[in-house]
Amino acid sequence: MRAIITFALFCVLYITVQAKTSSPKVQVYSHFPGEYGKENTLICHVSGFHPPDITIELLRNGEILPNTQQTDLAFEKGRQFHLTKSVSFTPERGLDYACKVRHMSNTNAYSWEPNM
């Protein structure tokens, strides 16, 4: 019995060491070049993160945009994950559009630049 417990603890320790934490890489862009007053799609692509504990929000002036679509969580080589969230929107001059990403205990907002 003691050998089984020791082996189980070894396995948990091994998995913990192998599962390195990786911060997400975030890209915020639109489907078409940004033009105020023209319908578009705001996209936030988050990749290269581990563990998969993550929340993505699309914002207009700090308020959550409704009717967003999110892909299923997918993984890459090296136990890293990626996820994309999008929403149809019509950009208005003077308003700020952003993607807020919470990964583990870190939260950051990334702005959409219409000239990208």
Curated annotation (Swiss-Prot):
Biological processes annotated in GO: antigen processing and presentation of peptide antigen via MHC class I
InterPro entries found in the cross-reference section: Ig-like_dom, Ig-like_dom_sf, Ig-like_fold, Ig/MHC_CS, Ig_C1-set, MHC/Immunoglobulin
Cross-referenced Gene3D superfamilies: Immunoglobulins
Domain of life: Eukaryota
Keywords: Disulfide bond, Immunity, Immunoglobulin domain, MHC I, Secreted, Signal
Disulfide bridges in this chain: 44-99
GO terms under cellular component: extracellular region; MHC class I protein complex
Location in or out of the cell: Secreted
Chief site of localization: secreted
Range of residues in the leader sequence: 1-19
Ig-like C1-type domain: residues covered: 24-111
SUPFAM superfamilies: Immunoglobulin
Function as written in the Swiss-Prot or TrEMBL entry: Component of the class I major histocompatibility complex (MHC). Involved in the presentation of peptide antigens to the immune system.
Family named by the database record: Belongs to the beta-2-microglobulin family.
Subunit structure: Heterodimer of an alpha chain and a beta chain. Beta-2-microglobulin is the beta-chain of major histocompatibility complex class I molecules.
Name listed for the protein in its UniProt record: Beta-2-microglobulin
Organism: Labeobarbus intermedius (Lake tana barbels)
Upper taxonomic lineage: Eukaryota, Metazoa, Chordata, Craniata, Vertebrata
Name of encoding gene: b2m
